[in-house]
Amino acid sequence: AFAQTGTIRGTVYEEGTGEPLFGVSVLVKETSTGAVTDFDGKFEIKVAPGSYTLQISYISYSSINLTEVVVKGGEVNVVSDLLMAEEASDLETVTVSASAIRTTESALLSVKRNAANLIDGISASTFRQIGDGDAASAVKRVTGVSIEGGKYIYVRGLGDRYTKTVLNGVDIPGLDPDRNTIQMDIFPTNVIDNIIVSKSFTADLPADFTGGVVDIETKDFPEEKTMRLSLSGGINPSMHFNSSYLKYDGGNTDFLGFDDGTRAIPTDGRTDIPQYGDAVGNPNGAKGMEYQEILGNFKKTLGGYRASSLMDVGVSFSLGNQIARPKATWGYNFALTYKNETEFYQDAEYNLYAKPREADQTELEPLERQRGDFGVNNVLLGGLVGIALKTDHSKFKLNLMHLQNGESKEGEFEFVNTNLGANFEAKQYNLEYSQRGLTSILLGGAHYINGNEWEINWKLAPTRSTISDPDIRFTRFREPTNTVSTEVGLPARIWRDLEEYSIVGKADIAKRISLFAREGKVKFGGNYVFKQRDFNIQSFQFATGNTEFRGDPNEILLDQNLFSADNRNGVRYNADFIPINANAYNSIATNMGGYVSMEANPAEKLKAIVGLRVEKFNQYYTGTNQTGTIDYDLVEVLDDMDFFPTVNLIFNLKDNQNLRASASRTIARPSFKELSYAEILDPITGRTFIGGLYPETTNGGTEVLWDGNLVSTHVNNFDLRWEAFQERGQMFSVSAFYKTFEKPIEMVQFLSDPGTFQPRNVGDGTVAGLEFEFRKSLKFIAPSLENFSWNTNVTITKSQIEMSESEYRSRQLSAREGQVIDDKRDMAGQAPYLINTGLSFNSYVTGWEAGLFYNVQGSSLQYVGFGNRTDTYSVPFNSLNLNINKTFGADERIQAGLGVDNILNSKREFVYESYQAQDQIFSSLSPGTKVNLRVSFSF
């Protein structure tokens, strides 16, 4: 009988560029059989079980002898990251043991070292070493990157507005369409090849970024068959198995991330429903009976209950392989992930403070104080299916992804109001549910002509995103009388729905050329993006008439308390969206772009890439203002036609050292929500967002504080970087960057309405910064520390905004005695420093891996003060996390891990800051310390 054959697969890269090498000869010395690498630099050879030597050769490159390539029957031996250097007169064949090749990080570092633009990244091998289960955990280890709320990525301390996330090079919306960055925790690391962060702009990238573009690259062709099941559980002593946890009974499918109709609006979304005035005169008439039917169909539950909370659980499954056929190779990936997480915040605070009227008083005065508990249950269900086909000269891929997210909240708060003389204390109850869905399809192809002389890439990606907030419930009783009134706020029910469609198409064509007697590349292409959003809010308020209550919110809508022919002064609803619904809008945006760029080596040690991008962006709005005096019907609210030049230079100082310089122009545009008249309330915090089209005036309308003309922000970017690379992935780099902002958009506090925030263009600004990064093995201290390494990256920035005339004047008018008002301030959202550092241990022999990681971001301006509304700043969150992993079992197919998050028990806080005043709490949450256990099985 014949022994079952095995397979050798690998990838060959050019050391000088980090690009895959096409046409490399790979010969098995013992059998004289072999293969030639394809356009991805990949090869595959079938051999009998045994130990072999691979002879790898390519014209003008130093050959490689790869020894100790062990092949087992029916299995795949993957030899990744074979780097071939251009041949020099004193170079001979390089011999290396296959057992020494452990990681794809070296290929990523090679790409980073030789890329003409400034990039950072993290590879799949690092995911496995550290034990990161999702992209959010992994990407925060990249230089200059931080994660907000465990999900959203910031680059160089710049906020979400200036960071963009793409999937396989294509722009897709996330579960929150108002963010540029998609939730990073929805991608399991076992379907990701690399995460690349581009910090400098090149013409083939979208122009709407400043801090960085984060590209999540999923696997096309797994090198070997992979089947992986991962289980995880998390316990936070302050949140889990806590009998004081707040919840309420929802639908039967909440555990899957969507409502089953339990929270459906009783009017079916109609706008022609009767009001109280239509029913009170004739309760038994047609409108009166319809009014009572609708009133009776509102769910009675307005308050939750306390019960023991459950721990966090998660499960993910992935499957992938490639199937070689005589004329083509097929690849497939499948991933399914499920998370069910519970949070419980006790003594949460949300406050409003302002400067007193008297200029000689510096301490801030409370307007509203809210303190209490709230529970959150968050469910995420996601699926990803990928199919790829590779022929001799082409590659095609199809990815389908669906994400479903459901989040329920229940809160109970003590509320104190001292604003405008309306002094009262109240008990507040909140019930919320939000469900979000994202369905995305990506179809793409790559074609190679004349070997790899010509390369054509194209992608088409339609996406549908939905958000539904069914039946948000708010109730507030005045204490101690347990009365309900307009003064304390009437009970309210809110239904919000958003539906967004987008389609992205792009094509890139690259041609290898000879320029300055050296190899170069010309690249050109274009893209088209279409997005449409429908947004609608329908809200109801409930007047209670003469009905008396005992402080139980579930009493209010009992049948005996409702309006009827016998109880005409009972509880009744009023539909706030009739006759004008200013919170409903429709928006359309189109973006048509094109570019041309050239990559060349004008001197032996100098590489340059220059390019020009043009984008035509239009946004249209349909909606009305709050008073109904302005009615837009597909009115153009943004019309941008911009050119974006870019230059990137890299000078090779030595074989392992580079000096980089880049300059470019980019843009940041307002979102659909920001370019609207919508008012959107967050019932838990009591804060309201108002669209940027809404103007604000004072002094009887004679002084304009904001004109409602929200425009895009143009950004000029300049970068300089020195970097040195050493063996085993060690490196050191120093970077400097400088950015100018024309009319940046920031969230400003509305002067006439406390707790309301609006996006506005402010004065021009600048950001200057330094970045430091090193990765160093501790072997230089002692040989026994060979398995220890220290990774650190630090970003330090200084930002400055020139205040607008209205902001500067408002600050002068509300200045305290002795206070000197400068016409410049910090830029909103820009952290002054960012520190990522970690000590890692990795032993391939024993299978133990461990790491202690620290991350902190400096205090940054979140909401811009105006008049007597003072600035709000974040408080640094000192994140210290521990990860320990152990692989064991046959072929190390089992991995178990322990993680401890927020070891220092830091709080997430934002505070008001004012001249010679004690900082006051804007918001405060205590996430506590969490212990995570995980185990994964590879089959």
Stretch-by-stretch model annotation:
Residues 490-498, 508-514, 519-522, 647, ...:
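Conserved C-terminal beta-signal and adjacent last beta-strands/turns
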Residues 31-42, 704:
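Short, acidic Ser/Thr/Gly-rich low-complexity loop/linker segments typical of extracellular
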Residues 487, 498, 502-508, 553, ...:
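Outer membrane beta-barrel strand-and-loop segments of large Gram-negative receptors
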Residues 433-444, 459-463, 496-506, 512-570, ...:
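Structural signature of Gram-negative outer-membrane beta-barrels, strongest in the C-terminal barrel
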Residues 70, 75, 100-154, 160, ...:
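Periplasmic N-terminal accessory/gating domains of Gram-negative outer-membrane beta-barrel systems
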Residues 13, 17, 25-27, 57-61, ...:
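Short, acidic, small-residue-rich periplasmic hinge/interaction motif at the N-terminus
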Residues 7, 278, 285-411, 439, ...:
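Transmembrane beta-barrel wall of Gram-negative outer-membrane proteins
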Residues 731, 736-742, 756-860:
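Gram-negative outer-membrane beta-barrel transporters
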